[in-house]
Amino acid sequence: MSHSAIKSERIGNVLCITVDDGRANAFSTSLLVALSQELAEAEADSEIGSVVLAGNQKAFFAGFDLDVINSGDPKAITEMTTAGGAFIRQVYGASVPVVAASTGHAVAAGALLLCGCDYRVGVD
């Protein structure tokens, strides 16, 4: 599954995943599922030695999508938060090191993602 906000680039044995939704990189269900798939594919590739996860120039990640939360739709909210928890656990337990290139603010679930990564680098 691809997502328009995700750009993946392989540099040697490192997979660089950059997310830029043009705003604050809020976690939507579709973004989380696509990120999970990107990481799973990297883990399955024996030539990938590590993954770097970066945001845009404004934010690393801003947490869950407030539009979904404010919608009051319990199914959509549950799907999004479940996908978020699953992705953070996947990052934490990944078979390859995951480096967070924190390009800006990491808010709420975005901060939890930082904690799940093996290494965190603040990028100015």
Predicted regions and their residues:
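Hydrophobic alpha-helical membrane-association signature
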Residues: 31-35, 80-83, 113
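Residues that form or flank phosphate/diphosphate-binding pockets in enzymes
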Residues: 26, 61, 109
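Glycine-rich beta-to-alpha active-site loop
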Residues: 87-124
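Short, small-residue-rich loop/turn micro-motifs
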Residues: 12, 55-57, 64, 111, ...
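Glycine- (often His-adjacent) and acidic-residue-rich active-site loop
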Residues: 47, 54-90, 106
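Conserved CoA-thioester-binding segment of acyl-CoA-metabolizing enzymes
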Residues: 1-54, 89
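Hydrophobic/aromatic residues within transmembrane alpha-helices
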Residues: 17, 53, 65, 113-115
